[in-house]
């Protein structure tokens, strides 16, 4: 097996890692590091924090965020199908209809369970 064909891929990976790591290392090495109490305190619109800045969030925020990401990701799977609509034929069409039916069943289940209600 000829490994010379993989040299551009290796170079691409190394450059990508370097673009991410080199600025971090340079900032850590060359940047000033003078922590004090004012820099480490929470900042709220120019005022001292009235209460603890770390507050608990309601679980519903996380639930809505997870549901959004889930359905957004599932809808993103439809774009390649739409691009290749003519090539996939009837089999691809039936597969997408089954996929959309599963999405609708999941959405109806979440709606019935009250995951989308704010009370």
From Swiss-Prot:
NDH-1 shuttles electrons from NADH, via FMN and iron-sulfur (Fe-S) centers, to quinones in the respiratory chain. The immediate electron acceptor for the enzyme in this species is believed to be ubiquinone. Couples the redox reaction to proton translocation (for every two electrons transferred, four hydrogen ions are translocated across the cytoplasmic membrane), and thus conserves the redox energy in a proton gradient. The keyword Mitochondrion does not apply. This is NADH-quinone oxidoreductase subunit A. Its main location: membrane. It is a multi-pass membrane protein. Keywords: Cell inner membrane, Cell membrane, Membrane, NAD, Quinone, Translocase, Transmembrane, Transmembrane helix, Transport, Ubiquinone. Gene3D superfamilies: NADH:ubiquinone/plastoquinone oxidoreductase, chain 3. It is found in: Cell inner membrane.
């Amino acid at each position: 097996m000829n490994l010379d064909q993989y040299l551009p891929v290796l170079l691409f990976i190394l450059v990508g890692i370097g673009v991410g790591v080199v600025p971090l290392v340079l900032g850590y090495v060359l940047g000033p590091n003078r922590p004090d109490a004012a820099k480490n305190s929470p900042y709220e619109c120019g005022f001292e924090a009235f209460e603890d800045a770390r507050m608990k969030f309601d679980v519903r925020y996380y639930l809505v965020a997870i549901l959004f990401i889930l359905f957004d990701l599932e809808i993103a799977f439809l774009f390649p199908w739409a691009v290749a609509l003519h090539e996939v034929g009837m089999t691809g069409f039936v597969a997408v209809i089954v996929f959309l039916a599963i999405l609708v069943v999941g959405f109806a289940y979440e709606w019935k369970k009250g995951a989308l209600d704010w009370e």
